[in-house]
A protein has these predicted regions:
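Active-site hotspot residues in diverse enzymes, especially metal/ion-binding acidic/histidine motifs
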Residues: 1-374
């Protein structure tokens, strides 16, 4: 039986190799006949081309094109990086980060159109602060809008519960939150905490926060508030002033100065004891101590370096854990509710919903059920 072979453009294959960022050597090892395909001395089979598409993280149809596809990298200029190492140029994004951005932007764009079509009101607080306001006024404004109980620290038993508590509040205010440690639902493609911890996409109709679920739970809480400040600014851009500003305000929201002063009087420099009370990581407390002039930049850097070298990150939404428990956070619980609403109103087909969430059939039904349960 003759095996069907496919005519391909070698330039398209090279584009896929470059797009994947895996490198030519990895492809040559995976596909021993790659050189012959590139030289056009032999043609790949349909199965071989399908396997290559999967390996390159591109749709199979792209490899059948006569010309290289023009796929722009959808840039984001705000990333909370590990110790805020700075701006990441779009041409430096890893394939995993690039694909994550595309997934999140696609979901946001759908939600913007859906909410406009259904006459949803904009989220009023997006862009409601600016850096000319005093820190106290900003903190008071954000607390008033979000309605976070002042006694939350005494009511919540763990940092994992604290994260869920804050996600619930933010989702109730119209912010869509995704927490994921992998690309989509592909557990073979983990996200790197050293590359980014989170990002925000400011839009009055559908503000979005993405948190890298590969990070430690306590670190995610600070990232969440850091990105909240970006949304209140109404921007997802980064400059030399914005990141320190967002860090400072996030620290003040999580660790108010009056409470920190009381804790410091009792446990000065004992960050383990402070951590137990504030329900936030020592990294956040280091930031608060710096913000409130209890330590200087040099001591802050030393503490962070020591902490990072001795604490392992634990992921709830990475490759581990029960899929049905983590999936609602990966695809966004609040986002799932909009999708369910759209299906019930006839504005979205099940096939379209499957594509939006990256799950289908019984898996889709179970994920939607878990998202509804919260």
């Amino acid at each position: 039986m003759t095996v069907a072979r496919v005519n391909i453009n070698p330039d398209v294959l090279m584009w896929a190799i470059e797009y994947s960022q895996r490198g030519l050597e990895a492809f040559s090892e995976k596909f021993p006949k790659l050189t012959k395909w590139l030289e056009k001395s032999e043609r790949p089979t349909v199965k071989q081309l399908e396997d290559m598409a999967k390996f390159a993280y591109v749709p199979f149809g792209y490899l059948m094109l006569s010309e290289k596809p023009d796929i722009p990298i959808r840039k984001i200029s705000d990333f909370r990086t590990l110790q805020n190492q700075g701006f990441i140029a779009s041409d430096e994004y890893s394939a995993a980060l690039r694909d994550t951005i595309n997934i999140v932007r696609s979901r946001q764009e759908w939600l913007i159109d859906y909410k406009k079509d259904k006459d949803y009101a904009p989220v009023a607080f997006i862009g409601s602060i600016d850096r000319n306001m005093s820190d106290d006024d900003i903190v008071n404004h954000i607390n008033k809008v979000l309605e976070i109980p002042t006694n939350w620290r005494t009511k919540i038993s763990s940092r994992a519960n604290a994260l869920r508590f804050f996600v619930d509040i933010l989702e109730s205010k119209g912010i869509v939150i995704f927490i994921n440690g992998v690309v989509g639902n592909d557990t073979h493609r983990p996200l790197s905490v050293s590359e980014f911890r989170g990002f925000a996409l400011a839009d009055k109709m559908a503000p979005v926060i993405f948190i890298n679920g590969a990070d430690a739970i306590a670190a995610r809480i600070f990232t969440l508030f850091h990105e909240v400040v970006h949304l209140f600014l109404g921007q997802d851009g980064l400059d030399d002033r914005t990141e320190p500003f967002c860090n400072r305000i996030a620290a003040k929201l999580l660790v108010p100065e009056d409470l920190f002063d009381k804790g410091w009087q009792k446990y000065a420099h004992d960050f383990e004891q402070l951590e137990k009370f504030f329900k936030v990581s020592q990294l956040v407390l280091f930031r608060a101590a710096l913000t409130y002039n209890k330590i200087d930049e040099k001591e802050y850097a030393r503490l962070v370096k020591l902490y990072e070298s001795t604490h392992k990150r634990i992921s709830m939404t990475g490759s581990g854990g029960d899929f049905y428990n983590v999936a609602p956070y990966r695809v966004g619980r609040g986002f799932c509710r909009y999708v369910n609403e759209a299906i019930n109103s006839g504005a979205l087909t099940y096939t379209e919903a499957y594509n939006l969430l990256g799950v289908k059939g019984k898996t889709f039904a179970e994920v939607m059920k878990k998202a509804k349960e919260g």
